[in-house]
A protein has these predicted regions:
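Interfacial segments at transmembrane-helix termini and the short loops linking adjacent helices
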Residues: 93-122
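Short runs within selected transmembrane alpha-helices of multi-pass transporters and secretion channels
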Residues: 112-137, 143-154, 169-184
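Helix-terminus/linker motif at the lipid-water interface of multi-pass membrane proteins
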Residues: 1-28
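C-terminal transmembrane helix end/exit motif
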Residues: 159-164, 171, 176-231
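Alpha-helical transmembrane segments of multipass membrane proteins
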Residues: 31, 35, 87, 91, ...
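Extracellular/periplasmic helix-loop-helix junctions in multi-pass membrane proteins
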Residues: 6-16, 101-110, 145, 156-175
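Juxtamembrane/interface segments at transmembrane-helix termini
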Residues: 34-49, 133-145, 187-198
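Specific pore-lining/lateral-gate transmembrane helices of multi-pass inner-membrane transport
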Residues: 24-101
Length: 232
């Protein structure tokens, strides 16, 4: 209902797109914080912990290093969420005042979209940070599950919201971001609860070669490439 045709198959929704773009800027604090604080504080402990496994560290040192690493991780994630919470609250509180000075033509509907999407992007930013930590611990299945849960929930609930009043647009993304945040956080808590087993017990005893669909496709194309045929 709020979409407009720009030209041909190119459509836009200015009443939604402009608030969405501005709301997205509110998560820059988390993006920067992950690089300058979370990784800076967490990675040295992470490297020390894994090097003890690789270099034959004693059990006591491994346990102490693991506890320190997880304590730093929990603290940094808490501060990240707190910074994003304060940023989101501040942006929502000041948006009516600031938008009044900008020639963007904000109406009540756009103000509602902006506030809804600020909350959604805040949850998404923190959830995405937790997902990146899952990748640090090589929990690819957990990270994939969290990403798919976000994609499915956001797409499904957004499609459902199209059946209601346009004032409810954006709540589908907000709910999907909440699902991502909770899924990634619960997965990280479960994964790190018994980290030594995850590192040692879930690794294969002998090396295994796994060939998925894309690997087989690549090998097939390589065998049938013109260069291979010329060499044959």
């Amino acid at each position: 209902p709020i979409g407009v045709q720009v030209k041909g198959l190119f459509y836009g929704a200015p009443y939604y797109d402009v608030p969405a773009l501005l709301a997205f800027l509110s998560i820059l604090v988390t993006t920067v914080n992950f690089v300058v604080s979370v990784e800076v504080q967490f990675y040295p402990r992470y490297r020390t912990y894994y090097s003890l496994f690789n270099d034959g560290g004693v059990v006591g040192d491994i346990t102490a290093a693991g506890e320190e690493m997880l304590a730093v991780l929990n603290r940094e994630l808490f501060y990240t969420a707190l910074k994003q919470l304060f940023t989101t609250a501040g942006v929502i509180s000041l948006e009516a005042l600031v938008m009044g000075y900008l020639p963007l033509g904000f109406n009540d509907l756009m103000h509602g979209y902006f506030r809804t999407l600020c909350v959604g992007y805040g949850l998404y930013a923190v959830g995405n940070t937790v997902l990146l930590i899952l990748l640090y611990f090589t929990d690819y299945k957990g990270a994939l599950g969290a990403a798919l849960s976000f994609a499915g929930a956001a797409a499904g609930l957004t499609a459902l919201s199209l059946r209601f009043d346009p004032a409810y647009y954006g709540f589908g993304f907000l709910a999907g971001a909440a699902v991502l945040f909770l899924t990634a956080l619960l997965r990280l808590d479960r994964f790190t609860r018994n980290l030594p087993y995850r590192i040692l017990g879930q690794q294969p005893v002998v090396a295994e070669e796994k060939a998925g669909a894309f690997t087989r496709l690549g090998l097939f194309l390589e065998r049938h490439s013109p260069q291979k045929k010329e060499e044959a």
